[in-house]
Amino acid sequence: RDNPKLIYASASGWGPLGPESQEPAFDYLGLARSGIMFAAGEPESPPTGLVGGISDQMGAIMLAHGVVLAVLARERYGMGQEVSVSHLSSMMALQGLSVSLACLLDRDFPRQARDRAWNPMWNHYRCADGRWLALAHLQPDRYWEHFCRAVGRPEMASDPRFASALEREQHAAEAVASLDEIFLERTAEEWVGFLKEKGDFIVTPINSVADLLHDQQVVENRYLHECDHPDMGRVRVAGPPVGLSETPAQVAFPAPHLGEHTEQVLQEVGGYSSREIESLKQEGVI
């Protein structure tokens, strides 16, 4: 009422409506409720946990998107509004394709077993150095014969069990087992270079998060940024994922301490005076 152009943003676990709207939530519960823990892992495995605060970060990203939309709406229509997101809504958005498929099919998109992948050319394999390699060929018949000859197994191309995508699906365990043996012959890095030299194969090594720190693509695209931290000195952090040719984004400062900007926000957004802010402190409001 006092400021009709105010944009107020809130983030919750389960959304502003419904019987659980006031229930607490953490990142792990956001993962659990969203369905993603049953989307990852092998078919017979229990729900698969994901580390790294995925649900928390998705909630923050979606909240930021919502605020930007509200600012744009205010510029166009002259009104503020409330912006709300939740762990649940954000994680559903992240899985938009899977959620839409479930709506159409009334069932989950099935997990894929690595050792009997319906498409052995869309799978991952352990290499001689212990690292894993991912193949991603959605048109496997286009690549299969060339692949078999490239890796020195021409007999697999003429094997009736593997003659087409349908036969390979019906004999998936045998096909994957054969490829398992093949990929143990070289390191992951060697396989990437070898396959790219032999043809237009679609392949990449599977990184751990720590591997990203030394990945040439990460380095050259500046997906890691450096910034000064008041407690830790010069640190590297994940940078903005969007590249802007004329106004490149950068990490200006680290995450703030709890309450670090309370006074600044009250003064700049709320119009509070220093005396009013001091009064709020004495009353224990802030």
Model segments located where?
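Short glycine-centered helix-capping/turn motifs at secondary-structure transition points
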Residues: 35, 216, 222, 283-284
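Active-site-adjacent "lid/gating" segments in soluble enzymes
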Residues: 1-138, 145
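Short linear loop/turn motifs
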Residues: 158-170, 206-214, 275-286
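Short Gly/Pro-enriched turn/cap motifs at secondary-structure boundaries
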Residues: 112-117, 123-124, 170, 232-235, ...
